[in-house]
């Protein structure tokens, strides 16, 4: 049975529930006696309460499994005792979806913390869980040695043999070989698949590999050639734009990133990257794009960028800053104000 990764609509419901509980969290925070330093800020206490709330959702067996899984994934944003305990319990759950959620949470952690949660699932009874555990830990391969490699290597070998013999399987094999520095094996797969499947996702995967070995010229050639057949592919324009940006060709990068955003304006990442580069030359365009992607996605990072750009341009940012104060930590907003409004 296939188990999908956490549905982000469920994650959104968790976040909305947390926001609705915000004021009650503040009230509860006021009643908590701080440990040690009495100058612990209310923001820190509220963050702890949010973490506790997510941990409670994660472990509440009365809730639907998708909501528990979404809460578990969001615990990856924290690394306090509540997160550690809840994610560890999820990793041992009888429900594969909870174990997958534990992996997604730990994926946001670093080094040993990630390893300790995920490594026991390298030989999970559920194939989807086992596969996701391998995919999560393989990125640590260049930094591992000794017993860690001894534990991970056979899991990777087993995973490689179980991958399907189709395009998806081959692209994943090539990605794994790249992480293991088996560049010749990776390139043989990419080249063969590109010659037989000149479609955007294959070209992009091959180009990303080439960028990784600092061959941007070849990567750009692959992307431009594929764009001839697929001129409406936003992903191709975006990948090409990033390649130009890597080598300092900022105007070429700007044109390609603008193309990507115009072709797929609902993609927040495309808009954010384009606007961040565009504001060097066209601050009004950047403001327009930041405002649009924030309205579409309501990501605090997009709102922060909008406020910052308004301040850079010397425009009225009061309404933007007021909204930012409702979704971002107070110290973040205060520091932004001080950069442009020191008095």
Each model region followed by its residue ranges:
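Amphipathic alpha-helical scaffolding segments comprising HEAT/armadillo-like alpha-solenoid repeats
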Residues: 47-58, 80-92, 111-123, 144-158, ...
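Terminal, low-structured helical/coil segments at or just beyond the last alpha-helical repeat
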Residues: 297-300, 304-343
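Structural signature of tandem alpha-helical TPR/SEL1-like repeats
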Residues: 112-115, 148-154, 180-189, 213-225, ...
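Structural detector for internal amphipathic alpha-helices that build alpha-solenoid repeat scaffolds
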Residues: 32-46, 66-78, 89-92, 97-111, ...
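Helix-start (N-cap) detector for alpha-helical repeat units in TPR-like alpha-solenoids
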Residues: 96-99, 127, 167, 199-201, ...
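Short coil turns that connect the paired helices of HEAT/ARM alpha-solenoid repeats
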Residues: 58-66, 91-97, 122-128, 161-165, ...
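Structural marker of alpha-solenoid helical repeat scaffolds
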Residues: 78, 109, 124-125, 162, ...
């Amino acid at each position: 049975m296939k188990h999908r990764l956490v549905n982000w609509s469920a994650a959104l419901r968790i976040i909305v529930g947390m926001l609705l509980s915000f004021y009650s969290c503040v009230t509860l925070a006021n009643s908590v006696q701080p440990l040690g330093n009495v100058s612990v800020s209310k923001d820190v206490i509220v963050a702890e309460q949010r973490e506790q709330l997510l941990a409670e959702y994660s472990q509440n067996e009365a809730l639907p499994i998708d909501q528990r899984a979404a809460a578990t994934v969001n615990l990856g944003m924290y690394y306090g005792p509540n997160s550690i305990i809840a994610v560890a319990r999820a990793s041992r759950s009888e429900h594969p979806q909870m174990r997958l959620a534990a992996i997604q949470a730990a994926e946001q952690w670093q080094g040993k913390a990630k390893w300790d949660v995920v490594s026991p699932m390298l030989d999970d009874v559920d194939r989807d869980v086992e596969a996701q555990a391998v995919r999560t830990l393989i990125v640590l391969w260049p930094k591992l040695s000794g017993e860690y490699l001894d534990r991970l290597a056979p899991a990777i070998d087993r995973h490689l043999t179980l991958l399907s013999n189709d395009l998806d399987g081959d692209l994943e094999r090539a990605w794994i070989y790249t992480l293991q520095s088996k560049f010749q094996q990776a390139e043989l797969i990419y080249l063969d698949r590109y010659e037989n499947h000149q479609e955007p996702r294959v070209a992009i995967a091959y180009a990303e590999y080439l960028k990784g070995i600092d061959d941007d010229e070849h990567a750009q050639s692959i992307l431009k050639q594929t764009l001839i057949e697929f001129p409406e592919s936003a992903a191709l324009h975006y990948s090409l734009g990033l390649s130009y940006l890597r080598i300092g060709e900022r105007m070429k990068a700007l044109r390609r990133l603008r193309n990507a955003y115009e072709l797929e304006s609902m993609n927040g990442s495309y808009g954010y990257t384009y606007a961040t580069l565009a504001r060097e030359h066209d601050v009004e365009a950047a403001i327009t794009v930041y405002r649009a992607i924030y309205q579409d996605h309501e990501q605090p990072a997009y709102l922060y960028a909008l406020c910052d750009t308004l301040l850079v341009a010397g425009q009225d940012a009061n309404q933007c800053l007021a909204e930012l104060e409702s979704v971002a930590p107070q110290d973040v907003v205060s520091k932004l104000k001080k950069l442009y409004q020191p008095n």
